[in-house]
């Protein structure tokens, strides 16, 4: 998707399906219709108030709404990589743009565009790590304290945590 937040109004795959070497074109809605499951969260986190994560489904491709630039909405399967790339260019997606928040501070302000209905205020979880009393004591006894605001957009606290899907087709044995 070229949009940060948008409803998918339609996806026309007909031109792509008729291109040389194309085996198929799948959309996020087809995955839902075929009851293909969602990607899972590898590490569920409890918020500091004890509640669980307020996270909805995480599909491999967006079925109805895109929530970040670059979110997949369709995939082309073809005999060669170049054929797949050419056919992908022929997929036509009609979007209805929705309001988006471009940074974390804007996303959590009252009245900000809501991205996930399961996460009020755009907060999936709110957590802390470490010992609050020991940290407070260290600051109180420090000779100098420096304050710095740092923004980590879409932070994943892992060295590598790809959200991906892969498929391999094997012809049935006869």
Identify the meaning behind each predicted range.
Residues 1-126, 145-148:
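Flexible, low-hydrophobicity surface segments
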Residues 54-64, 132-134, 153, 163:
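Short, charged beta->alpha transition segments
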Residues 125-133:
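Charged, often Cys/His-bearing segments associated with DNA-binding zinc-finger transcription factors
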Residues 134-174:
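Conserved beta-alpha junction segments in alpha/beta enzyme cores
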């Amino acid at each position: 998707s070229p949009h940060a937040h948008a409803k998918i109004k339609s996806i026309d795959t007909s031109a792509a399906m008729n291109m040389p070497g194309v085996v198929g074109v799948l959309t996020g809605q087809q995955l839902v219709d075929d009851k293909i499951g969602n990607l899972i969260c590898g590490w569920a986190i409890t918020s500091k108030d004890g509640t669980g994560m307020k996270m909805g489904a995480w599909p491999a491709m967006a079925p109805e709404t895109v929530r970040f630039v670059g979110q997949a909405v369709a995939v082309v399967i073809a005999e060669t990589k170049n054929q797949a790339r050419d056919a992908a260019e022929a997929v036509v997606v009609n979007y209805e743009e929705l309001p988006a928040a471009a940074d974390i501070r804007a996303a959590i302000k009252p009245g900000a565009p809501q991205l996930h209905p399961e996460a009020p205020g755009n907060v999936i979880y709110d957590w802390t790590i470490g010992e609050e009393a020991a940290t407070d004591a260290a600051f109180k006894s420090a000779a100098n304290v420096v304050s710095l605001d740092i923004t980590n957009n879409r932070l994943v606290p892992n060295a590598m945590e790809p959200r991906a899907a892969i498929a391999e087709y094997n012809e049935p044995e006869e």
